[in-house]
């Protein structure tokens, strides 16, 4: 099967650094992970053949870890340590930086107005979301009750979509997280942090939407 006919989420999981490539092209492989590469490229007016060629080069590299075959409990523990704990560190720091940048550079035309507000909204939503996963959904899955967790999983997927929408707003008001020429050190550091946070959150959502949740529902 050609890469163009495969879902983005599957490609992101099976090809090393494919997720970074999709991020480069602003293709949603987490919440939009079920769409094929061809469909995603068409929506962005991108040349799918060029992306396929880049994926073919990446596919020659060994995959560090295939989470599709890992025990569900191990996936959950990885998600908490690698993503949940990291988001809890990232967002408060980014909010502090955004507050400073918006205040100090209020008169600059390229200042990301509203960034503090939307980062705060994302922090609040994710804090509630991760707590529900850790206290309700993840214990159910670890106890082998994933097949009965359709309701909670549906809610979590809906909240993933909401987080994805907030990321789009954040990218819009930061000009795709690109610092302007006049950006100070704090401004540049903040944008580096936002890019890292977006990468982490997209990988996090992809692992849940495309691996953990389907396998839990299927009792695998």
Swiss-Prot record:
One GO cellular component term noted in the UniProt record for this chain: cytoplasm
Localization annotation: Cytoplasm
Pfam families in the cross-refs: Hemerythrin, ScdA_N
Gene3D superfamilies per UniProt: nmb1532 protein domain like
GO biological-process terms attached to the record: protein repair; response to nitrosative stress; response to oxidative stress
Single Gene Ontology MF annotation: metal ion binding
Origin superkingdom: Bacteria
Keywords: Cytoplasm, Iron, Metal-binding, Stress response
Cross-referenced PANTHER family: IRON-SULFUR CLUSTER REPAIR PROTEIN YTFE
Function: Di-iron-containing protein involved in the repair of iron-sulfur clusters damaged by oxidative and nitrosative stress conditions.
Oligomeric and partner information: Homodimer.
Similarity comment: family membership: Belongs to the RIC family. YtfE subfamily.
HAMAP family (UniProt xref): RIC_YtfE
Protein name in the entry: Iron-sulfur cluster repair protein YtfE
Lineage of origin: Bacteria, Pseudomonadati, Pseudomonadota, Gammaproteobacteria, Enterobacterales
